[in-house]
Amino acid sequence: MARKTALAHGKTYTRGEMGGYMIGMFGQNLIYQIVNTGLYFYFQNVICLPAMALGWIFMLARVWDAVNDPIMGTFVDRTHTRWGKCRPYLIFGPPVIMVVTIAAFLNSNYADATTTSGRIAIIAWAGISYILWGMTYTVCDIPLWGLTSVMTEDESDRAKALSLARIAAGFAGVGVMIVQVAQAVGSTFEASGLSHSEAQRRGFIVTAIGFTVLSTILFEFAGLFTKERVAGSEEHYTVKENFRIMWKNLPFRQILISGILRSPIQLLLINAMTVVTYYYANGDIMNVFGKNGLNKGILINMVLIGGMMFVGNFLGMGIMPGLMKRFEKKNLYNFATLVGALPYAFMFVLYLMAGGDVKPLVWGIPFSVCIFLSGAAQGALNVLQSVMIADCVDYEEYTNGIRTDGVFFSGQSFITKLSSGIAALISSAVFGYVGYSGANVDKLNDALHAGADFLTYDGGTGAGKYAAAMMFLISIPPAIGMALAAIPTWKYALSDAEHTRILDELVARRAAAEAGEEAPAVPEVPAE
């Protein structure tokens, strides 16, 4: 068991500041869910963009965002104001994100476009608005996570802050409900005489505006009600130098590569509402309120699938702080990736064993258990990744005298965004292969609205192919990605004992610098 005796320090956040930070984190991640789940669903299933166009929009935007992250990290580390280096972006940035988020939903139905120029304009607006959203989101995302490193010097408090931040972000998963709410709002427009497709489009626009305004108000708490306590490096570095700093940091490089390898786990997140809406609710969440009353089958499956995912995620995040005090973070990380691959793979096995229909409870219950376990693994990895990246910041300061919090936490955003882009491209390739794309989706929506069954629907490539594609996407690629993710971190370069020694010495250095003395050396920990 690693030594866990880091010094306790007075420079740390108050309970009120932590509360403000968590509210802000919730608001920021609510916006992320509005776009990552709601906008993706809107582009794919409401305005019916072609599958490959959608995939390339998300992929190129995410790659561009990922490259922008270290650039933004450089700006953060060069920022010195009376509010600190992170808080200014969190005070003034959220309203800009709000405007761009709403603008992304103000688009037309691709299937209704009658001219080539009209179709090009719809795709172009989708691409431009999404790229702009990613750029504005980055301006606040890097400072928000970097704030945890400058709010406290205490290792335990920082780990606690990161864990609570991940939990707050997890609660923001309720943002996926934008799809259900939007479809409900859309049904009221349909009742007034609009076509089904136009009613759904307007329902999403109205709902997106409401969700985004609320999220922005909450997001502001992180900038307004926190305080920075740890000074950054006095030296400034170019973007190129910061890329070099990140890449030369061996433990960070291992985390970065591992995070990219497990990119396919994002497939479950970006396709979750598509699966719930089409596979379980036959294309419209409002089908839970059937003609003969409440459809208990749909409701139970929605609760099982959605509920178990969130419960598993929260459990994984919630138990990590305690487990990190008892076990090596590297071992916990590798365990979560390898064991976490199994429930993903078993989901597709259950789908095949059930003959393509896992809605009956005899299959639905074990399927939901797999969802629960995959959510727990993902929640655990989210916390571990954040804490391990924070450790890398200390490692860099100790090794080279450089503390670039913004740059290193931009790496976390880099992983998330690039992973989402890769997942979107994989998703679009599979959906494009089975024909779930463009006008075909519009035809599917009309057919389901007229009474067709999604599980047996034939869009031209074979009955049930759409359903099979969805189940494949949320299971097999994520299983492969999770298994591969353990390879880079199998021999992780920064043990917990060594990090504790490093942090103790850094605190001693800072205290000595303030007193004008030379810091005493902390004995090195023998390599394990």
Q: Where in the sequence are the language-model features?
A:
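Membrane-embedded alpha-helical bundles of multi-pass transporters/translocases
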Residues: 2-528
